Amino acid sequence: MSKYKFETLQLHVGQEEPDPATDARAVPIYQTTSYVFKNSAHAAARFGLTDAGNIYGRLTNSTQDVLEKRLAALEGGTAALAVASGAAAITYTIEALAANGGHIVSQKTIYGGSYNLLAHTLTHYGISTTFVDAHNLEELENAIQENTRAVYLETLGNPNSDIPDIDAIAEIAHRHGLPLVIDNTFGTPYLIRPIEHGADIVVHSATKFIGGHGTTLGGIIVDSGKFDWKASGKYPEIADANPSYHGVSFVDAAGPAAFVTYIRAILLRDTGATISPFNAFLLLQGVETLSLRLDRHAENTKKVVEYLAKHPQVEHVNHPSLPDHPDHELYEKYFPNGGASIFTFEIKGGQEEAHKFIDNLKIFSLLANVADVKSLVIHPATTTHSQLTAEELEDQGIKPNTIRLSIGTEHIDDIIADLESGFAAIK
């Protein structure tokens, strides 16, 4: 279906024809744990990866399969794996690349949960991380070590929507024989396709824009199919005979889908962060309206940013669409159709004023999620990034008066009126 536009692909990929068993137009929910094999030879072929298809519900499901094919197509990848959450998608990706003493070079301005995962949790599994200013390409390249196994970025940093130069960083990573991993949760494939700029693996918290309605947890790993795992010589679990799967080389068995096949067959098999068929179904409902929602998110965000930038009670707005933002040129390069509907601003005052502003909003919901059709707000320093030290918060540009907004699809007049009520409470 590659000849079709994004808006058509988001509706049809993975189910080009009605369901063969029922003729249903909507993707059915295949609520089953297991699958019947035709005979013993068929079962052996499935387990040997010589016949593609369902083996067991922890690994695959037909509803999940449609979601995976659709997201792979939308991102321009070869294959995808859907898992139980965005955190699982990121964890599996890093573990697959860097287990047993590997090292990651990561952008420092990332989601607090991902920062904590890399800085603390994964160290117990022998994985270390150096956090760098992704705008300083020399610093990033100098951080690469002999045991480095990947470079990790976000298309739009969390929470300040800063933007790395993906093309330039991809060139550095590839020159050192490393894959570039990009979290495109905030970007979405509708606004930016990182694979077209050199990314090798793209991850998502599908809980956010992909689902879009604050109802469903899920994560996605998309394999570009472009990285040469054998040539690099750094990934024997993927490229060489793997003793955990009766000597299979995933490169030989799965070709360009080797990376996600390895995660599915080994990590997902053994640790089981499986997405439920129902969650896969709900995320598919979100995918079908992705472009429509993102257009409205972008339209509303532009107007909110303009409003905040002129407000006398606002100290600073961190949004790359503003001409004085340090990433404005990168924003115009990578996001020509707008975006960055999750961003921060600094209210005049401190933490007390920030909390009072938030507590007097009515339409904006105070919660930890983002990228919902409903507008959302939170105080990062005391919530999503509260695990960080004072020094780490400062390093990531998060201050006591920083407020994060996630702009929804409500009528813009109501959104701005609600923000005005928050400001009125602290006059």
Please provide the spans of the model-predicted regions:
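N-terminal "arm"/small-domain region of PLP-dependent enzymes with the aminotransferase-like
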Residues: 2-61, 69-70
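Conserved N-terminal alpha-helix of the aminotransferase class I/II PLP-enzyme fold
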Residues: 39-91, 113-120
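Short hydrophobic/aromatic beta-strand micro-patches
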Residues: 222, 344-346, 406-408
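Conserved PLP-enzyme active-site core in the AAT-like
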Residues: 2, 18, 80-311
